[in-house]
């Protein structure tokens, strides 16, 4: 595995390296705020070694028509199965039990030493009525994947409370099954400095501190900075000209809550 492009994350890299080298199946949950680099970390660590990747899709007002929501997520899951090698002659799954049976079929046809499954944006994939999907995920793990001894299943999500309630502290099929839990934090100021140096920014310590106070250590925001601008111009662009942060305010709450209005009202009142 190659870690050359990753800034910091030494503890997390050591965990992922260990699970790849282990001689048993591993079930890993990764959570942390949006834009903090969860998907990037997994993709950079494992790359093409990931045999199957599914990504949950945000659907506005999904709680108002759950069956349509579920079928769309299942359709996307099926597309990922086909990309992973499932024959298009196989019928599309109509429920999560069928979906995970098809995933098992795909993996049984692979001869890889370690079979890595990456399920990203799990809260969106499971949906407003998440119990069915989580129950079937637990059954998939307990009835087959765990005993195979060569499966690595990584689930990832930005909705922290959801991940804690439904995966990490689950009292159903996933209870006590996680072999590793990773909470990914923003970059420290020191890691931001490494980022700037690696990307040819010529900043004083003062400018680095100004940047950190303005946008924190969020890799997504750091990636929007340009090394041919002063830090003042970069911050002006992000907050005003490009309206990146203004749009982020809308996107973050939309992505985390099905009914965001009351949370937005609270933040606006505090501000």
What are these regions (language model features)?
Residues 1-271:
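Phosphate-binding site recognition
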